[in-house]
Amino acid sequence: MQLISIFLFICFLFLLRKWKKYSKNSQTKKLPPGPWKLPFIGSMHHLAGGRPHRVLRDLAKKYGPLMHLQLGEVSAVVVTSPDMAKEVLKTHDIAFASRPKLLAMDIICYDRCDIAFSPYGEYWKQMRKICVTEVLSAKSVRSFSSIRCDEVVRLIDSIQSSSSSGELVNFKERVIWFTSSMTCRSAFGQLPKEQDMFIKLIREVIRLAEGFDVADIFPSYKFLHVFGRAKRKLLNVHRKVDAIVEDVINEHKKNFATRKNDDHALGGENLIDVLLKLMNDKSLQFPINNDNIKAIIIDMFAAGTETSSTTTVWAMVEMLKNPRVLAKAQAEVREAFRNKVTFDENDVEDLKYLKLVIKETMRLHAPIPLLVPRECRKETEINGYTIPVKTKVMVNVWALGRDPKYWDDVECFKPERFEQCSIDFIGNNFEYLPFGGGRRICPGTSFGLANDYLPLAQLLCHFDWKLPTGMEPKDLDLTELAGMSAASKDDLYLIATPYQP
């Protein structure tokens, strides 16, 4: 007991010294305003008991659109207005182009040798170029069209089977199953035996990657990391994910030798095929190895399965709450697919209202409410305030989408609001940034949207959807899961009645 007391006292003195050093430094720089801070933990107590993007929006109403927080030993700035977002993502984009270290990504992504979380530099530039030009190019996304159509047919068949037996359909579970199968086949060329386990593990990573673990707020105090639960869980998840993906890569390597002289276009191959070819590219500044491939695959699954399924589920929730929108969207898709025995993605191109539904869903339910955080590379002045080097910068895109200065009836689900405006997904409009903006904008935007449009269109075309008997739209639970994404917390059970023209 005495040894424990001595250890805790030493920890207290060590932290007190660091706190005094921080206080002295903060007094010499004009930091943005922020809520009051406590010794050691800084502003962390303000985030207790709520989802961070909601708590931070409320704090910003008092302290302003550029707000400073002290998250343990990490200095952080939260952006909550389009003007400030433009400063970070465009005007000073290069100064904020890097990523802070996060425990989850260090462990899961092989010391951040992926694309989404790697620090800004030549390696990131190389890997992003590969991603944009070969892995997730428009040509590659189109090449996956037959896989999407095939998986949509399987999705429709599974729901028809359940509805014919009188079962309630777990809409959320079915959509996750679709997006995971679609992503597996795009990445691996097939459905791995451990698909369900793999997706479960990836979703656990997303839950653990919020960035507020002890290791993330006290990164230099290694002795404190033993008190965090996340590290043990992440190491266990990493071990299992690594084994699954390693097996898939080795299987592809065996088959790759027999196909190395096959001159297929890159867009027609799966992700691992593309990366294995590049592994032999001697012109690359940074040679690709197994860890690079595994890290990029994890990126694709974390983004491809979670964000797409989250958006599709929230779109259905909002349409059930707004029957007028549901009826209008169904009328459009049923007219587009009328008298067609088969379908393809060309039919989706003309579904203008459905696209507005997805766009409005992302306004209210940004897939990643606090964009993947950036890190300041160079001391920068914004709006008269100093942003020091190594500051963690969070852009609250969830709050941007609900800013009453830019949006009318912010809490209302109105797809029509986008009919006569030029707002797009590519980061040009700073009040609407579901995929981010600037150099670190999500490179998989086209892939993600394709995985939203087609399945939602077919689900609306083939079924009439109702809430279970006795349940009203007002009873729908809008609670979000903890973690980096904003997925709905509860399953969504619905009655699916096959549509008879």
Curated annotation (Swiss-Prot):
Its cofactor is heme. The keyword Secreted does not apply. Signal peptide: none annotated. Heme binds at C442. Keywords: Heme, Iron, Metal-binding, Monooxygenase, Oxidoreductase. It holds the Pfam family p450. It is an enzyme of class 1 (oxidoreductase). One of its GO terms (molecular function) is iron ion binding. Its EC number is 1.14.-.-. Belongs to the cytochrome P450 family. This is Cytochrome P450 71D6. It comes from Solanum chacoense (Chaco potato). The gene is CYP71D6.
